Swiss-Prot record:
It is found in: Cytoplasm. L-aspartate binds at residues 119, 123-124. NCBIfam families: argG, PRK00509.1. The gene is argG. One of its GO terms (biological process) is argininosuccinate metabolic process. Keywords: Amino-acid biosynthesis, Arginine biosynthesis, ATP-binding, Cytoplasm, Ligase, Nucleotide-binding. Pathway: Amino-acid biosynthesis; L-arginine biosynthesis; L-arginine from L-ornithine and carbamoyl phosphate: step 2/3. GO terms for cellular component: cytoplasm. Its EC number is 6.3.4.5. It catalyses: L-citrulline + L-aspartate + ATP = 2-(N(omega)-L-arginino)succinate + AMP + diphosphate + H(+). This is Argininosuccinate synthase. It is an enzyme of class 6 (ligase).
């Protein structure tokens, strides 16, 4: 038996076409691997059967929902990861997990080639191929969409000519990627920056402009940086994301219309929905404001940004990311407590905080009676703090 091709299969246009195309052009057997990341929508058995219908000799579905939440989304929560201060890495977080399971499938099913359906314009080609090179440098990589310059029109035409079962049409050409952490929509009329998204773009969130009858108040509890409760009820990380997706999504929270800087050098417009992710990152960030010492918090904000950039750039398996996570793990020792948030009209508002690890001292902070702050020490502090600036200013004035 010749070496098999192990394909990262989403059930969408490009990877459905890829199964048939690889078989026709290379003569090799294709094993399709679909990863359940909590994306919802179609039943995964339907996706698996579609891969078989498209020509795969085997189709494997891996339930990786808890793994994704605990080993990929949780580090993003603890690093308050927002690329360009906005994008919660919806797609970027899932790619290294898919890579891991594709490598496992290659070992199990006799695959010498791994394949993906990424274009040459996107970030995912980098995330997949750098991941393969890191975990399994012996495997060859096939990227038919990129290497043979497929366009969406060509892919649709190929699918129609070969009776490939897909739902995409030329009139509805959105490219959609989704998982429990969020949903990403691109292409079509969204490529024109002035075009406003239409209702059919969204799925995880309700229209935030609707006059909702009442806000939703939610309390998120953390232990050492891990979300462990919603309104006092124990939850796993996956359950926390799922429950907040539903509650925040119902309030229109988590819609993002972003023009982002891609790794390949171009700018791209993306529409994201990440209700649960945005609530958890907001709550975790607020709890860190309460529990982290000032200089540690300042420095961690720098590492948070770098961690997000590394993940976005496909460097999940890099030594720097690993080192940053060791630092982040140390910072989470005291990040325990509860944050109360109000979800309403597309907005998240924090209105309560409590923690046994809090560095907020009421007696030091209050301006009422009982104030224990020694204000007599402030005059000397101000003088010493500004000494270098005053000396420099004195020199500059003397030189005029």
């Amino acid at each position: 038996m010749s070496e098999r091709v192990i394909l990262a299969y989403s059930g969408g246009l490009d990877t459905s076409v890829a199964i048939s195309w690889i078989g026709k052009e290379t003569g090799k057997e294709v094993v399709a691997v679909a990863i359940d990341l909590g994306q919802g929508g179609e039943d995964m058995e339907v996706v698996r059967q579609r891969a078989i219908d498209c020509g795969a000799v085997e189709a494997v579905v891996v339930d990786a929902r808890d793994e994704f939440a605990e080993q990929y989304c949780l580090p993003a929560i603890q690093s308050n990861a927002l690329y360009m201060d906005r994008y919660p890495l919806v797609s970027a977080l899932s790619r290294p997990l898919i890579v891991k399971h594709l490598v496992d499938a290659a070992r199990e099913h006799g695959g010498g080639i791994v394949a993906h359906g990424c274009t040459g314009k996107g970030n995912d080609q980098v995330r997949f191929e750098v991941g393969f090179a890191s975990l399994a440098p012996d495997l060859k990589v096939l990227a038919p969409v990129r290497d043979y310059a497929w366009t969406r029109e060509k892919a649709i035409a190929f699918a129609e000519e070969n009776a490939i079962p897909i739902n995409v049409t030329k009139r509805s050409p959105f490219s959609i990627d989704q998982n429990v952490w969020g949903r990403a929509v691109e292409t079509g009329f969204l490529e024109h920056l002035w075009n406003a998204p239409t209702k059919d773009v969204y799925d995880y969130t309700e229209d935030p402009t609707v006059n909702w009858s009442s806000p939703d108040e939610v309390v998120v509890g953390f232990e050492k940086g891990v979300p462990v409760s919603i309104d006092g009820n124990p939850v796993t990380v996956l359950q926390a994301i799922e429950q907040l997706n539903e509650r925040a999504g119902a309030q229109g929270v988590g819609r993002l219309d972003v023009v982002e800087d891609r790794l390949v050098g171009i700018k791209s417009r993306e529409i994201y929905e990440a209700p649960g992710a945005m609530v958890l990152i907001t709550a975790h960030t607020e709890l860190e404001h309460v529990t982290l010492e000032r200089e540690l918090g300042r420095y961690k904000r720098l590492t948070d940004q770098k961690w997000g950039e590394l993940v976005y750039d496909g460097l999940w398996f890099s030594p720097l990311k690993s080192a940053l996570e060791s630092f982040v793990a140390n910072t989470q020792e005291h990040v325990s407590g509860e944050i109360r948030l109000v979800l309403h009209g597309g907005h998240i508002a924090v209105n309560g905080r409590r923690s046994s690890e809090s560095l907020y001292d009421f007696n030091l902070a209050t301006y009422d009676e009982g104030d224990t702050f020694d204000q007599s020490s402030a005059k000397g502090f101000v003088h010493v703090h500004g000494l270098s600036s005053s000396l420099s200013a004195r020199r500059d004035l003397a030189g005029k």
